[in-house]
Amino acid sequence: MLKRVFDIVFSAGWLVGFAPLLLVVAILVRLKLGSPVLFVQERPGLRARPFRMVKFRTMTDECGPDGELLPDEQRLTSFGRFLRATSLDEFPEMWNVLLGDMSVVGPRPVLLRYVSRYSPFQARRMEVKPGVTGWAQINGRSAIGWDEKFALDVWYVDHRTFWLDMRIVVMTFFKVLARSGAERAEGAEPLGEFRGDGK
């Protein structure tokens, strides 16, 4: 109950307080990357229930002569890299928190296709709502492998408290200021494809 109250107050305050910044970023995304401004993708939530996660776009839709999208590294602009490094692309996820699909703190939502590849241990990370930030994010982010990431997520599930959430929120701000480990492809995972068994 306390966690949900915190989620509502924090996300509502965030969206209102950062509304001018969100508007500026949205305008810049529209000018530099085109439309749509938001990137929307289904992700697994609590008990694997799909929800539509929203983020700011960070890549263009440029295609090659064959009509196929260019490789991610060619579509990612310096502006997109900046959004990722500062985590500004993730600010709209607070809307998901306000709706109740996500929490401020919890395991980061991965791709839907990964759910069937989880071991029973790894699947335990879905016993709580996914978060905007989490225990794994302040303990390595994309610098750790899938096994360690999922182990940290399950550790959080077993040890979660309101005060641990507060610690994670505070430490996240320091991580964002340091711009640590945020490079990734749009809609993809910073660790590469998860194929099961920690791979």
Spell out what each predicted region is:
Residues 39-75, 133-151:
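Short, glycine-rich, amphipathic interfacial segments at transmembrane boundaries or analogous
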Residues 27, 40, 55, 75-78, ...:
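Residue-level recognition of specific faces of alpha-helices
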Residues 10-11, 39, 77-81, 113, ...:
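Positions in alpha-helical segments
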Residues 8, 126-199:
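C-terminal terminal-structure detector
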Residues 1-61, 168-199:
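A hydrophobic, helix-centered structural microdomain
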